[in-house]
């Protein structure tokens, strides 16, 4: 052992790591992960097919055990684990993995459900018919052979490949620092593209796409949109969307609809897909599905999704596409080896490299065949002369003492012959070559019959024509391209089939809003921070003084604090107690029943400790001419442009810098010309002009809006309109309507006037809203009881009155929220 390291070389570890890793990376790139652009195969696939070729494991021969093939591959050509080789064989035999299978398998080779193949000792394989086109002309010196890993065998550096395998079967692999993901295509279309390129190598991409419109996956499906295809074909990189194919079936008995999926996207595991759908239904992320079954059999795929009678199949379908692998994005990255170097290729470049490869193969094949044909023609020429002079030749052979002497006598003699026009000589003198003499000496006696003589002449004539044709192919590129074209047409006729994947013009980008049904909803936020929305249609209008319906199941110490009526597609601006604004879509909130309490908003927004949402504002559209007007409990107001809040951030943005112990109580949209009304819990109100407050930046603190007493605070912010009245409600369930004209316009920062007479009976103000006759209002108590009342049923009273009963509350029950509903039901 002491003699193993006789010399130690000191090297810099950084340089050694760099050099060694680079060697490893190139080994993976060239020798394992990336296909060659010429035959579309990685080394392992090429070695598998060559090993089967050596074994004569052809499509028209008997199957051989997979283990036999694996053993030959790893023993002779591929010094890696048997599982890596067998996994490659399995994939080459799966009709859902390769568009055109290269191996014909017998036995269990796995399934689209992700089931593993049987062990290689149980399965049998042979080459498929099309795979032999990859190896055609291999024995005609068409490709170079290189030593195997130990130098005991030789393997082809590349396969001759008559088929454009890189495109028709695609390829995927991850190397070091790069990856490839080439989708499969239809053979007919790819060959049509090749023929068009042969006809005009200056063909444009747009013209080429007329022949090759896009990928064609073995699992069919639908490709949505052509933009990604064109981008990938032009640059080598792009993204396409593959969608499952479905149909809607209606049950004749119960009239319920079912969505039937009978084609799924490429490389999607069907079993996991069904599990995901079931999980989404269980989590109630998809509502409306009543049953889910896999009815797939030997005749085809069939995934059945039964939906509720009242559910809309289009919405559920879009939700399934968005949330599951029923629609996937396929990233195209056409990287392949070109002359041993990885390169990102366009569609046109791939065709160019393949056809250049075919030209090289046809050239080498023609040279090989020409040499072989010329040698045979030379022999036939000698035999023809010998048959003319057969008697003389026989005499020489008889006189010779040995075969060597006979050969020398025949070579030295000058021969005279007739029919010279069939022999390429200028005169009648002829001298045999050594090869010709050997053929003459090997000639059997039965060849001397007249019939055999005619056969030799006919064969010679055929060879002469073949030599002429081969020389023409080698001299003329046009003729060579004709040969390539004819071979491609033959491949198309023998193996071409119909396209499976449909390509549509539809926009593949499914926005979440496309999946959500537009409907008016009630959004509630409890004092403890539980938020939810539920359809507005869940509530019917009641008479004044009714007991109401339960709007939320809440804990005894919790109560509903905020309630807004909005639409599922609107934006909710959530203003926190710290003056931070958070941006959400209504549909991002949890949808719950009336009896559910919803979800904690802290799970939806990144709120910090002791931070809570104090105001929510629904926004339908962010318009530049609108403002956000804010009011705090201490009477501070601030106006900022709505466009300041257009771009959300995950962590939120500053809406207002609050003073100590202050918080937001109201937010409203204004146009710069409105009036502003601030109502306090002790029954005060001030109305002033909006233009008395200048527009400020998001981080400003604001200005004084109303002067308040020590034990008072602002509870409502209203932007009034001329035709509306103000409805004021108290925590004991009292309320009234008062005309807006009864509230005088004062200067900003004054104490204001009386809005409602506060007594022990009616309690303090919990809120004020503006209403018209056709409006309805909602009131909610801290016990979770909700009542819906028509505004027209509430009397119009003067400012200095205490109001009438709007909702009857039980002991310790207080009204905590008030909201207007614009459109009555």
Curated annotation (Swiss-Prot):
Please state the protein's primary subcellular location: cytoplasm
* NCBIfam families xrefs: gyrA (TIGR01063), PRK05560.1 (NF004043), PRK05561.1 (NF004044)
What the protein does?
A: A type II topoisomerase that negatively supercoils closed circular double-stranded (ds) DNA in an ATP-dependent manner to modulate DNA topology and maintain chromosomes in an underwound state. Negative supercoiling favors strand separation, and DNA replication, transcription, recombination and repair, all of which involve strand separation. Also able to catalyze the interconversion of other topological isomers of dsDNA rings, including catenanes and knotted rings. Type II topoisomerases break and join 2 DNA strands simultaneously in an ATP-dependent manner.
UniProt keyword terms in alphabetical order: ATP-binding, Cytoplasm, DNA-binding, Isomerase, Nucleotide-binding, Topoisomerase
Q: What else is known?
A: Few gyrases are as efficient as E.coli at forming negative supercoils. Not all organisms have 2 type II topoisomerases; in organisms with a single type II topoisomerase this enzyme also has to decatenate newly replicated chromosomes.
Q: What class of enzyme is it?
A: isomerase
The Topo IIA-type catalytic domain extends over 34-515
Q: What is this protein called?
A: DNA gyrase subunit A
Q: Where in the cell is it found?
A: Cytoplasm
Which Gene Ontology BP terms does the record give? DNA topological change; DNA-templated DNA replication
Q: Which CDD domains match?
A: TOP4c
Task: Name the gene that codes for it.
Answer: gyrA
One GO MF term on file is: DNA negative supercoiling activity
Give one Pfam family.
Answer: DNA_topoisoIV
Q: Which residues form the active site?
A: 122
Where in this protein would one find the motif GyrA-box, according to its record?
A: 542-548
């Amino acid at each position: 052992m002491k003699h193993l390291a006789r010399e130690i070389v000191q090297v810099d570890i950084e340089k050694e790591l760099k050099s060694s890793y680079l060697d490893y990376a190139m080994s993976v790139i060239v020798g394992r992960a990336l296909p060659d652009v010429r035959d579309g195969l990685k080394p392992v696939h090429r070695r598998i097919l060559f090993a089967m070729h050596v074994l004569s494991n052809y499509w028209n021969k008997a199957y051989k055990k997979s283990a036999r093939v694996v053993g030959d591959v790893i023993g002779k050509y591929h010094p890696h684990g048997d599982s890596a080789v067998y996994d490659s064989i399995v994939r080459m035999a799966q009709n859902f993995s390769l568009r055109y299978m290269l191996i014909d398998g017998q036995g269990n080779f796995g399934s689209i459900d992700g089931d593993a193949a049987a062990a290689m000792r149980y399965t049998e394989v042979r080459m498929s018919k099309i795979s032999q086109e990859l190896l055609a002309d291999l024995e005609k010196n068409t490709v170079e052979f290189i030593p195997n890993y130990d130098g005991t065998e030789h393997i082809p550096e590349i396969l001759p490949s008559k088929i454009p395998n890189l495109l028709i079967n695609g390829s995927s692999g991850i190397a070091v620092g790069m990856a490839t993901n080439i989708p499969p295509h239809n053979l007919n279309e790819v060959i049509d593209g090749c023929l068009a390129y042969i006809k005009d190598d200056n063909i444009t991409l747009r013209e080429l796409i007329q022949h090759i419109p896009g990928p064609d996956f073995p699992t069919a499906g639908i490709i949505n949109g052509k933009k990604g295809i064109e981008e990938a074909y032009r640059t080598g990189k792009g993204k396409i969307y593959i969608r499952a194919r479905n149909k809607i079936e209606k049950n004749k008995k119960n009239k319920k609809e079912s969505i039937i999926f009978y084609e799924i996207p490429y490389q999607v595991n069907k079993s996991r897909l069904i599990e995901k759908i079931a999980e989404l239904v269980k989590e109630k992320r998809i509502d409306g599905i009543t049953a889910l079954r896999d009815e797939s059999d030997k005749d085809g795929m069939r995934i059945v999704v039964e939906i509720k009678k009242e559910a809309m199949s289009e919405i559920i379908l879009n939700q399934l596409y968005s949330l599951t692998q029923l629609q996937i994005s396929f990233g195209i990255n056409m990287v392949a080896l070109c002359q041993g170097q990885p390169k990102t290729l366009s569609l046109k470049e791939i065709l160019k490299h393949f056809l250049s490869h075919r030209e090289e193969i046809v050239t080498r094949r023609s040279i090989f065949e020409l040499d072989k044909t010329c040698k045979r023609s030379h022999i036939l020429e000698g035999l023809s002369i010998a048959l003319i002079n057969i008697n003389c030749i026989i005499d020489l052979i008889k006189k010779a003492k040995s075969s060597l002497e006979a050969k020398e006598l025949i070579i030295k003699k000058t021969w005279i012959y007739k029919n010279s026009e069939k022999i390429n000589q200028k005169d009648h003198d002829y001298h045999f070559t050594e090869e010709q003499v050997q053929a003459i000496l090997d000639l059997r006696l039965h060849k001397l019959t007249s019939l055999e003589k005619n056969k030799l002449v006919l064969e010679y004539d055929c060879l002469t024509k073949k030599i002429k044709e081969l020389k023409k192919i080698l001299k003329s590129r046009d003729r060579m391209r004709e040969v390539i074209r004819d071979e491609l047409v033959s491949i198309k006729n023998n193996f071409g089939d119909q396209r499976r994947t449909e390509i549509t013009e539809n926009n593949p980008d499914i926005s979440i809003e496309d999946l959500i049904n537009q409907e008016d909803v009630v959004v509630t936020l409890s004092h403890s921070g539980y938020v939810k929305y539920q359809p507005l249609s869940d509530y019917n209008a009641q008479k004044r003084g009714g007991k109401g319906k339960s709007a939320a199941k809440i804990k005894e110490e919790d109560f509903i604090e905020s309630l807004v009526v909005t639409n599922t597609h609107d934006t909710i601006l959530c203003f926190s107690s710290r003056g931070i604004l958070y941006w959400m879509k209504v549909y991002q909130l949890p949808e719950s029943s009336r009896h559910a309490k919803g979800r904690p908003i802290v799970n939806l927004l990144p709120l910090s400790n002791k931070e809570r949402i104090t105001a929510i504002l629904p926004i339908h559209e962010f318009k530049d001419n609108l403002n956000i007007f804010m009011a705090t409990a201490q009477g501070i107001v601030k106006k900022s442009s709505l466009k300041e809040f257009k771009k959300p951030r995950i962590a939120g943005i500053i809406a207002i810098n609050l003073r100590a112990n202050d918080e937001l109580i109201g937010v409203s949209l204004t146009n710069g010309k409105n009036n502003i009304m601030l109502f306090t819990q002790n029954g005060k109100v001030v109305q002033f002009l909006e233009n008395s407050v200048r527009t400020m930046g998001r981080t400003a603190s604001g200005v004084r809006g109303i002067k308040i007493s020590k034990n008072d605070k602002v509870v409502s912010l209203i932007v009034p309109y001329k035709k509306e009245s103000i409805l004021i409600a108290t925590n004991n369930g009292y309320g009234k309507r008062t005309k807006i004209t009864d509230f005088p316009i004062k200067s900003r920062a004054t104490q204001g006037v009386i809005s409602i007479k506060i007594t022990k009976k009616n309690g303090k103000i919990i809120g004020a809203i503006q209403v018209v006759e056709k409006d309805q209002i909602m009131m909610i108590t801290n016990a979770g009881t909700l009542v819906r009342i028509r505004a027209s049923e509430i009397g119009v009273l003067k400012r200095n009155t205490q109001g009438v009963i709007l909702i009857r509350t039980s002991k310790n029950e207080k009204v905590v929220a008030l909201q207007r509903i614009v459109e009555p039901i």
